[in-house]
Each structure stands twice: as C-alpha cells, then as structure tokens.
C-alpha cells in the first residue's frame, strides 16, 4: 500500500513537472530591460490562465506551458503598448527563447484591457495577491487561502506571519476586524468572499508618521471582498449533531459598505473547538500597544496569577463552549470614524492527567504518583469603543477605551502517592474575577513639512481578587500554624487582592531635515502604583476560622514605580543604507512599603540602540538591530509574606530585587523573488542578561519553598531561524529550521548549577495546488531537545510525519483528511511514547448551491491520551494527558 502511494505521489509530481518552457527578455525600444512587465499565457482551448510571470530587474521572464497546446502570450507594461504572441507546444519541441520589445504609448497609459488579473502585483510597499489565482474553490476560511499564498504562514496558534514577521493587524476592506485579531479572522472570514489579499509592509496606521521611524517589522493584511459581498449581508449558518449529545451551532453574519461594517460571530459546541481561550483573553490587547517598548524599559504586570491549568494542544477530556462576538464600524462623515467590539466566551473544560514525578537530590530521593482531575469554567468578557477624528491631513486624534472582565473557576482533585509522605488526597478550589479598564489618547499634528508632533497618553486600572482553597490530608509545611484535627483534612484558604494603576505619557517631536533624514526627540514618563493584600486562614470542621496573623504569613504592600526618560534618535537614508542610532536616558524611582518598612531606590540608566538596514534590491534586504533594555518586576515578586501556590508549593518574594539588564542583538535576512515565488527568511538573535531575577527553591520531599533573588551570574540565549519556500508550477515546497541555545543557572537547596538547553526543530513539506483533481501535503518534522547540567545530560526527540489530503469526486463530494504521527523518545532508550491523530471530513455541495452537508470524524483512530515528559537537574516528570475520544458529527451549512 505504501509503495502504491509513493508511486501515485511520484506520478503527480512528474506530471506537473512535464512542461514546456519559454523564456526571454522584455525590453523597450532602445534596448533597456523592463522590470515588472507582466506576461500571461492563455490556453486557447480552455481560455484559462495557464501561466504568468513578472519580469525581474534584467527584464527576464520564464513561463511553464503544458505540452501539445496553443497559447496566446500577452505582454504589458504600464505606459507601453501591449503585445500578443501565439505559441504552440509539442512533446518533440525543445524549450523556446523569445524576446519582446515594447514601445511607449504617448496617448494612453495602456490601451489593452487584460482579461485576466495578474496573480501578484506590487504597488510600493503593498503586495497584492489575487486570491482566485492561488485557490481551487475548496477553501472554507481565510486561513485556508492564506496558507496557499507565497511567503505567508499560519502558525499553530493561528497567528499569521509574512516573511517571518507577525502580522499585527487584519482588516477587511480597510476596516479593522476585531481590532485586527488574527485568530478570529483566519477562523471565521469565509473564503468565497475574498477577492484579494493585500500585504501592507512597513505599515503605519498614521499617514503623517509613515517613514519617520522604522516600520520594517510592522505588517498588516487587508482583505478585499468580492463585489457581490459589498453593500449586502452575507455569512453562513452551520448546525450539527452526533452521538453522545454532541452538538455544533455556528452562525456568522457580515455586512460591509463604504460607511459602515458589522461582523457577528457565534459558536456553541461541545466537540472541543474553542474559538476563544483564556490564553487568548489574557493576550488580547485590543489594539493597545506597549508605549514603553521603544523606551527600553518595561514594567510588566502579572496575569493569570491563579496559575490556572492550560489545555494541551487545545485538547482536553471534554470541552464545552459558548461564544458570541460583535464588531462594528461607522463613519458618519469623512473626518470621523467610530468602531468597537464586544466579545463573550464561556468555556467548561474537563481535564485528567496522570503523572510520575521523580526528585533526586544529594539529600534525598522521592517518587510521587499523581492522578489529577480538573474541572475549569471561564466566563470572559471584552468591550471596546474607538473614535478617530481626522479633519485634515495635518491633524489626527484617536481615543480608545477597552474593558475586560472575567469569572474564572477551577476545581482540582489530586490523589498523590509519595515514597516519603505516603497517600494523600487534595482538593483545590481556585476563583478569580479580574477586571481592567484601559484608555488611550493619541494626537498627531503636522505643523509644517519640517515639524511633526505626536502625543500619547495611556491609563490602566486593573483589579484582581484571586481565592485559593485547599483541603489536604497532610499538613505540608510546618511554617503554617495549622491546627491538626484528628480524622480531618487541613482546610486552608488564601485571599488576595491586587489593584494596579498605571499612567503612561509620551511626547514625540520630529524635525525633518530632508527626504532622507530626521531627528526624533522623545520625552516620556510612566507612573505605576500597586496595592497588594493577602491573608491565609484555616477553617475547622465546625466552620471556625483560624486567622494566621503573623506578618510573615500575610502581605500588605504598597509599591510605586516611576520612570521619566528622554530619548534622541537620528534616522538617515544614504544609498541603500538606512541608519538609525538612538540613546535613552532614564531616571527611575521605586518605593515599596511592607512589614512596617519603606525601601526606596533611585537608579538611572543610559540605554543605547541602533538600527541598520541594507537594501540589496527591492525585495532583498539585511537588517541589524541592537538595543539595551531593562525590566522591572511588579509587586508579586517583591512581597515577602508567604503565598500559597499549590498544595506542595509556597512562595515568598524579595523586597530588595533590582532591575536586570539585557543586551539584545538581532540580524535578519529577507529575500522574496516574486518572479520565481522563492521566499527566504533568516534570523539570528543573541541576548545577554545581567543581574537576572532567579527563583531560588528549597526542595523538601515533594514540597517546594521558593523565593526570588538577583543573580550576578550572566546568562545568555542564542536563537536562529531559517525558512525557505518555493513554487514549482503546482507544487509548493517548504523547509524551515529553528535552533535555540540557552545558558542559565538553577538555585536549588542553596546549590548553584549551570544548565544548558538546546532545542532544534526541522520541518520540510511538499504540497500540491491543482484546480481540479486531488491535492495533498506531506511533510516531516523533527524536534530535538538537549538538556545538559553539571550532573547529567539528556536528549529527547520527537518525530512527526504528517499528511493532509483533499480529494474531490463525483463533482459534488470532497474528502479532507489530516494525519499526524508523534514518536517521542530519549537518547538513553528509557522513554518511548507514540500516538496518532487522524481527522476526516466528507463534504457534499452541488455546484452553486447554498447548502453544504458535512460528515466529520474527529480522532478517527481513537487516541486516548498524550504522553509528555519533562526533565530538569533534580526533577523528572512523565505525564499522561487524556483527550476526547473518537466522535462523529453530521452538520449542515447554509450560505447566506
């Protein structure tokens, strides 16, 4: 069977490669090559677009044409009269060379109307893909379309990357789609509504600011809709059901016009498809940017302080979700633009994990077997309103307000059997209701061609009230004065309240020297205040509460942090080089009051940075970036009273922590050849860390007491990424590699040891893209993790062959299948785990019908669990994580 599949794949590849080639040069009347002239080949029998090319800098073109056919070549260039040429191919005919000379058209830019649009066109910094040129009509969502575009990748987290850079915003007809969130866009925008995909490189939302700074890392997508989708409501309604009360309901509705847009997305299911996780919730910025990122210093507030469990690979034993989202935009006039969104998500997740944890130190050894059952519910709410006022090209005002509110609950039941402590049953309850409101005001003003100003003010209010409760048959820590009631479990509760107020402001002044250079002066400030209160108590069998009032067991901390800084940058473009050196001077002041003492520190820092770009040619460049940065921890790591982190883990902060210093170096190479659809992207990054904040842990059997310290030992990280993709006719090849090396230090039981981790990831794949007939993707991924310490060395390898299949048959049927095989092992041959996932979907839809029927089988091979292992110098963990069993679902979709 494997041999037959191999022969079939070879036959498909060989057939696609058996083509006739015609190449040559396109020149003007005096012999100068014409770069970016368009050449298309129309099959005279089918009247379809057979091949196309855009000439390179030397005017060169190359077309691949099918044998035994006649084609009309159409050659065009803006401002020149077009030409046509008829050519016939045959098996016996050799490859052909043909040059073309175009003559300037003085009357009109181009009199010939092209019947077919070019698959790819370039307009300045915008790369425009004609979606129909890369798709075959079987695509369902935007993500399916983007995967077929050269240079565009979709990550496992549904983030979009172009040339290795994360897309910061996705728009539809120029309007933000849920503030540009990529996951909601790739999963919900219907593929059949897409006309073009515009890649906006060097993107800047404010036209006045474009080109003043370095926007090379800013990439946005604009999805252009087909004409039939404008000024009309469109969308789809999907409903389905299956055995064991499986259900799915997924209505979506969209409306776009020049003045307004509405997007409505809903999703109700219990089949494990989670449209919006609380990982998405915590990372969802609402379009708000970190204002201090360019300043070189960061003050980051903690999120998910409860330490909630995360689903692995978006899978769990059972998942039920209810999701609803509304996004709108409205432009009452040319000067004012209003938009906003509301999102609600409810998810109930049932997780089960069995684990064996082995601890081996110089003082003791212990083996603990755990069975952990977790029931987690989350209700997440987000609300945002934005207004943009732009009465002229010289003035723009933006205002945003963004609210986030949630209710998070988690119940854990843990059975622990330890070689030291014996049997133990633990029930853990976690609850939190975090709330935040973020406001943003931006003003951009162009006084004249030489003087440009921008002002930004951002305010954040954040509140959290996490509750932690545990019922434990053992008293884990003698430091806690718990009362031992015979035959009862220890009932401990920790209440925590954290309030954060943050106000950031910056003023930027740009003095434009000429078209190639400008000077930027920045004055900024950041004011932060945090109030933290924690309290631990025990509840007895008669519901009496025993408060632990010792100062070391509670926290009452007030923390203030202020950063005032002045920055200077100079940008100059000379020849093919862009050079931007900069310097920031920071004056910091931070104060924390706890345990009756006040601690103040007033450090200053001078942080340099430099950006260099060398344009080898229009679509090939090298960039280098260096910056020095520093980071300040929030109050959670400074509070010295005890925190209950888990049934076997306590934590205490360190009020004397100081800020670490980072030196970051990044070198990037980018090359996109749209003439051959070859994309090469590479990055090398090196980061050196000084005065790092480290966790210092004391292990006592299965228990751990941790704190934080500043380490004088330097640590560094090196990483390199390389991605290569190329198209050969109907074949798309991809290859990528990632390597990272980290040197860091562990402090356990007072001993300091150096550790080195090396991660290597290599992936290669081949995919076909035929308009008719089967399509497939086959690939192989291998990941190697090396962990080296002063005591031991371990190597873990994961091999994953994967394949995707798309088979249309009987005109109205399409079969889709996705297969992945995981093989996990270690170099010492002590671990060997493997599991397989196979999902299949059978679609039925008549031509031009609005109805679609779908039969889905998920986890077809009924894989019951995922096996995972982790390793450190003292602790080795092997876990079995259970997932949803095989199920099938019959669904019906109606396209509106």
Q: What is the role of each PLM region?
A:
Residues 19, 25, 31, 58-62, ...:
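Membrane-proximal, glycine/serine-rich, low-complexity loop/turn segments characteristic
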Residues 30-43:
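Short, ordered, surface-exposed loop/turn motifs in non-cytosolic proteins
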Residues 42-48, 70-86:
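A short, solvent-exposed loop/turn motif at the edges and junctions
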Residues 45-60:
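Short, acidic Ser/Thr/Gly-rich low-complexity loop/linker segments typical of extracellular
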Residues 371, 548-554, 652, 658, ...:
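Outer membrane beta-barrel strand-and-loop segments of large Gram-negative receptors
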Residues 384, 492-580, 592-597, 613-615, ...:
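Outer-membrane beta-barrel transmembrane domain signature of Gram-negative proteins
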Residues 763-781, 794-896:
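Conserved C-terminal beta-signal and adjacent last beta-strands/turns
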């Amino acid at each position: 069977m494997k041999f037959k599949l191999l022969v079939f794949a070879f036959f498909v590849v060989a057939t696609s490669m058996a083509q006739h080639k015609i190449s040559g040069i396109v020149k003007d009347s005096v012999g100068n090559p014409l770069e970016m002239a368009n050449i298309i080949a129309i099959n005279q029998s089918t009247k379809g677009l057979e091949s196309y090319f855009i000439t390179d800098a030397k005017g060169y073109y190359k077309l691949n044409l099918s044998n035994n056919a006649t084609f009309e070549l159409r050659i065009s260039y803006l401002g020149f009269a077009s030409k046509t040429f008829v050519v016939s191919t045959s098996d016996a005919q050799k490859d052909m060379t043909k040059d073309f000379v175009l003559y300037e058209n003085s009357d009109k830019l181009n009199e010939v109307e092209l019947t077919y649009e070019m698959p790819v066109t370039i307009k300045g910094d915008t790369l425009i893909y004609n979606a129909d040129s890369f798709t075959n009509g079987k695509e369902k969502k935007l993500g399916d379309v983007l995967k077929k575009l050269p240079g565009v990748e979709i990550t496992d987290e549904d983030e979009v990357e172009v040339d290795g850079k994360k897309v910061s915003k996705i728009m539809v007809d120029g309007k933000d789609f849920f503030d540009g969130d990529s996951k909601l866009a790739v999963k919900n925008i219907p593929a059949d509504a897409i006309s073009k995909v515009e890649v906006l490189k060097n993107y800047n939302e404010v036209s006045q600011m474009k080109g003043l700074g370095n926007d090379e890392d800013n990439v946005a997508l604009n999805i252009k809709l087909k004409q039939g989708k404008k000024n009309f409501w469109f969308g789809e309604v999907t409903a389905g059901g299956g055995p064991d009360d499986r259900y799915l309901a997924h209505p979506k509705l969209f409306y776009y016009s020049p003045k307004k847009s509405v997007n409505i997305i809903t999703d109700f299911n219990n089949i494990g498809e989670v449209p919006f996780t609380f990982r998405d919730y915590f990372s969802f910025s609402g379009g708000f940017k970190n204002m201090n990122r360019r300043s070189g210093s960061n003050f980051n507030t903690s999120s998910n302080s409860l330490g909630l469990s995360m689903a692995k690979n978006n899978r769990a034993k059972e998942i039920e979700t209810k999701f609803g989202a509304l996004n709108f935009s409205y432009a009452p006039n040319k000067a004012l633009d209003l938009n906003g969104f509301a999102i609600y998500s409810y998810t109930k997740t049932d997780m089960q994990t069995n684990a064996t944890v082995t601890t081996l130190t110089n003082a003791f050894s212990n083996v603990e077997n755990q069975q952990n059952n977790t029931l987690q519910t989350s209700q997440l709410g987000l609300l945002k309103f934005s207004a943009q006022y732009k009465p002229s090209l010289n003035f723009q005002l933006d205002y945003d307000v963004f609210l986030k509110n949630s209710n998070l609950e988690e119940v854990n039941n843990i059975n622990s059997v330890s070689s030291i402590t014996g049997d133990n049953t633990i029930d853990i309850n976690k609850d939190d209701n975090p709330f935040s409101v973020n406001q943003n005001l931006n003003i951009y003003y162009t006084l004249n061609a030489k003087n440009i100003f921008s002002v930004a003010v951002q305010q954040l209010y954040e509140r959290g009230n996490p509750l932690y409760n545990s019922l434990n048959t053992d008293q884990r820590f003698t430091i806690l004065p718990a009362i031992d009631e015979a035959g009862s479990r220890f009932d401990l509760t920790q209440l925590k309240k954290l309030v954060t107020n943050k106000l950031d402001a910056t003023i930027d002044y740009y003095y434009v020297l000429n078209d190639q250079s400008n000077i930027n002066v920045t004055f900024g400030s950041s004011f932060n205040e945090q109030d933290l209160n924690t309290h631990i108590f025990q509840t007895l069998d008669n519901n009496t509460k025993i408060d632990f009032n010792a100062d070391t067991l509670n926290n009452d901390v007030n923390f203030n942090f202020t950063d005032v800084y002045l920055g200077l940058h100079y940008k100059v473009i000379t020849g093919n080089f862009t050079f931007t050196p900069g310097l920031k001077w920071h004056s910091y002041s931070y104060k924390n009051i706890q345990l009756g003492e006040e601690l103040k520190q007033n450090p200053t820092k001078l942080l340099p940075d430099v950006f260099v770009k060398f344009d080898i040619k229009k679509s090939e460049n090298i960039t280098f970036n260096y910056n020095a940065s520093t980071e300040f921890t929030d109050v959670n790591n400074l509070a010295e009273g005890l925190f209950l982190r888990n049934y076997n883990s306590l934590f205490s902060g360190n009020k004397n922590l100081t800020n670490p210093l980072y030196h970051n170096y990044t070198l990037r190479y980018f090359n996109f050849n749209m003439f051959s659809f070859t994309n090469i992207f590479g990055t090398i990054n090196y980061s050196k860390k000084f005065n790092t904040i480290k966790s210092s842990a004391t292990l006592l059997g299965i228990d751990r007491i941790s704190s934080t310290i500043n380490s004088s030992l330097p640590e560094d990280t090196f990483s390199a990424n390389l991605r290569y993709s190329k198209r050969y006719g109907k074949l798309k090849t991809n290859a990528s590699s990632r390597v990272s090396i980290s040197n860091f230090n562990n402090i356990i039981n007072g001993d300091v040891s150096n550790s080195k981790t090396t991660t290597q990831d290599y992936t290669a794949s081949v995919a076909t893209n035929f308009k008719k007939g089967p399509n497939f993707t086959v690939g192989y991924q291998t990941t190697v993790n090396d962990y080296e310490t002063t005591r031991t060395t371990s190597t873990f390898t994961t091999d994953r062959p994967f394949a995707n299949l798309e088979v249309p048959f009987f005109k109205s049927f399409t079969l889709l299948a996705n297969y992945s095989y995981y093989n996990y092992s270690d170099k010492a041959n002590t671990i060997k785990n493997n599991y397989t996932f196979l999902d299949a979907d059978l679609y039925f839809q008549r031509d031009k019908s609005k109805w679609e029927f779908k039969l889905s089988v998920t986890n077809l091979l009924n894989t019951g669990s995922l096996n995972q292992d982790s390793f450190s110098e003292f602790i080795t963990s092997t876990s079995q994580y259970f997932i949803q069993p095989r199920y099938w679902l019959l669904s019906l979709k109606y396209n509106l």
